[in-house]
Amino acid sequence: MINALPPNHSDTVRRIVADMKSRPGPLLEVLHAIQSELGYVPDGAVPLVAQGLNLSRAEVHGVVTFYHYFRRTPPGKHVVSLCRAEACQSMGADALAEHAKRKLGVEFHQTTADGEISLEPVYCLGNCACSPAAMVNGRLYGRLTPERFDAMIAERGQKK
């Protein structure tokens, strides 16, 4: 499970832990900060976080693996987040998700073989009036159809 981190990643993790360890219950905040800076929470960060926060490796690993939000591998160049909430489901999000998986050749929480696109589920983007919705690299899309999804992906240089 534990892999060595590059020195620059180790320094980043140590800095984040040092900056936040005095806050009450800092583990989630620390993990979010690590993912924000590195794009994911590497397995090699677990012992550094555990040591810095005086927790067991099992406690830190348990939190990282419990919350689907935390990535344990580097994300693709583009992150496509498909809304899975009820409003979007009622407007065809399930069919859109199946189309996206086929189009990209991945399941949720996976990245295309070329490292370009990661497909992630989210539970409400706040765009319910324009469902089904997705977000790509922070840009919100609404009223998606399979055709509009394909065009959205093509904008990213992904022409499958």
Each model region followed by its residue ranges:
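Signature of N-terminal electron-transfer/Fe-S-associated modules in redox systems
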Residues: 1-160
